[in-house]
Amino acid sequence: LKEFFRTKTKITRSAIIASLVVVAIFGVLQAMESKSATTDQVNLTVDVASVIDVTCPDPSAFGTLTPGTAVTTTATCTTTTNNSTGYILQAKRDDADTTLDLSTDATTNITDKTAWDSTANTGDGNAATWSGTGLGFRVMQTGTDSGYSSTWWGSDDTLTNAKFAGLPSAYDTILDVSSAGETDAAVGFRLDVPAAQTAGTYTGTATFQVTANP
């Protein structure tokens, strides 16, 4: 009987030891398994640059002007930008004194209307309805997709309500667009001269510039 209990005790101890070994191995395997898959994150950032571009194809020529009978033409500037706050369109003449000079004598000019000043009259600008002679321009309501200012350029495009100004000698803002995308701005020119204006071909250029809004 004693021998029986000795044998049983040995078997029990062996079983306990075996169980402990199995538990230990299982614990190691669990630990190994829990460490076999782990995660971490990486942060990806990129700054997309603001891009902006403007194209202003040449307008059609004024043609032949008879003094006292005004002529008009229109240039359309197309601006493309991804800047979420949009852009400003600015314009200037490229001649120091007047926009249009006689091609054979640069000292003979066509008078410009009073140069546009967007800051005049507490920001209302200084464009005025048409009268008399000279070269004037304005942003047109028709053909301008966004940003048209009736305060600056008149309530509509009719001659009674449309406001004109002369091209400035330095860049000045003529349109403010507040969103991204592709937009057109129609810029109208109107010209008349007095009867005493020297006959001949007059030429000149205006430059448009777009700048992304902050």
Predicted regions and their residues:
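Signature of Gram-negative chaperone-usher
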Residues: 30-214
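Sec-dependent, cleavable N-terminal signal peptides
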Residues: 1-38
